[in-house]
Regions:
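Structural signature of hydrophobic alpha-helical transmembrane segments
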Residues: 20-37, 86-100, 125-135, 184-195
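Membrane-interface alpha-helices at helix entry/exit sites of multi-pass transporters
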Residues: 25-32, 54-56, 149-161
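Transmembrane helix exit motif
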Residues: 40-46, 70-83, 92-119, 205, ...
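Small-residue-rich segments of transmembrane alpha-helices in multi-pass membrane proteins
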Residues: 20, 25, 60-71, 102, ...
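Residues that define the loop-to-transmembrane-helix transition and helix capping
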Residues: 26, 92, 153, 213-216
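Cytoplasmic-side transmembrane-helix entry/capping segments in multi-pass membrane proteins
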Residues: 53-64, 95, 116-126, 156-161, ...
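Selective hydrophobic functional segments
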Residues: 31-85, 168-212
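Selected transmembrane alpha-helices and immediately adjacent juxtamembrane segments
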Residues: 1-22, 108-159
Length: 236
């Protein structure tokens, strides 16, 4: 519901909760990914008429090579550490860097014109890495929607579509390289899928009552809190 109202926050919050409950880092990322696939897919369906298609095309064009690079890196790590499965690797060490990047983008970078659509090409590539090695690529791409002349519905829809394809693309990596069997996790995933659907429907209703200025303030505030959480992830 949080993601449906302000475009983000729900995924990272869920990732943090799952990290507490599930000890295996790779399984947290894998299960979080399929839940977010449904969550973003639901938002894409609800807001499909608001998707900024040019941004999405650029993002996907960068995402595909990014995912292939992720698969190549995972394979290289398997060979280097001489393990039988990528499930034995620790892959969540980049989270603090994402937090630092967000703070820089929001508050420290030289302000100028809004980011062009072309920037989403290389951001798609970075997301192909982040979605596998970190789990939540939303905070990475979200700052690129700040100060753009698009509506709050455009932000919600386009960001959700970008993340949907990112989570979809990483499923084969976790199935074949991390030996994740999603069918065995059905009892855990099904209730969460149902909650995601109704949360999105309610979130859309609330978004319609939210002024654009308030939305952008909440969006930036949520990004800042998420950045701080990512930077201190190894402390708490």
């Amino acid at each position: 519901m949080l993601s449906a109202i302000i475009g983000m926050g729900g995924g990272v919050t869920l990732l943090g909760i799952m990290a507490i409950i599930i000890p295996e880092g790779y399984l947290v990322v894998a299960l979080h990914g399929v839940i977010q696939l449904v969550s973003n897919g639901t938002r894409v369906t609800v807001y499909r008429s608001h998707i900024h298609k040019n941004i999405l095309k650029k993002f996907i064009a960068g995402l595909i090579p990014g995912l292939f690079l992720s698969a190549g890196l995972v394979f290289a790590l398997i060979q280097y550490y001489n393990v039988s499965s990528a499930a034995e690797l620790k892959i969540d060490f980049l989270k603090p860097l994402i937090g630092i990047y967000i703070i820089w983008f929001l508050y420290l970078r030289k302000k100028g014109k809004s980011v062009s659509d072309k920037a989403f090409l290389w951001m798609g590539g970075l997301s192909g890495l982040a979605t596998v090695f970190i789990g939540a690529a939303g905070p990475l791409i979200a700052p690129f929607f700040i100060n753009r002349k698009i509506t709050k519905e455009n932000v919600i829809a386009t960001k959700a579509a970008c993340q949907f394809f990112g989570h979809l693309g990483k499923l084969p990596i976790f199935i074949f390289m991390f030996d994740v069997n999603y069918l065995n996790q059905g009892t855990l995933l099904l209730p969460l899928f149902i909650a995601v659907y109704f949360g999105t429907k309610f979130g859309k209703m609330m978004l319609g009552k939210l002024p654009e200025s308030t939305f952008r303030l909440l969006f930036k505030g949520a990004l800042t809190l998420i950045a701080i959480r990512l930077m201190v992830v190894d402390i708490f």
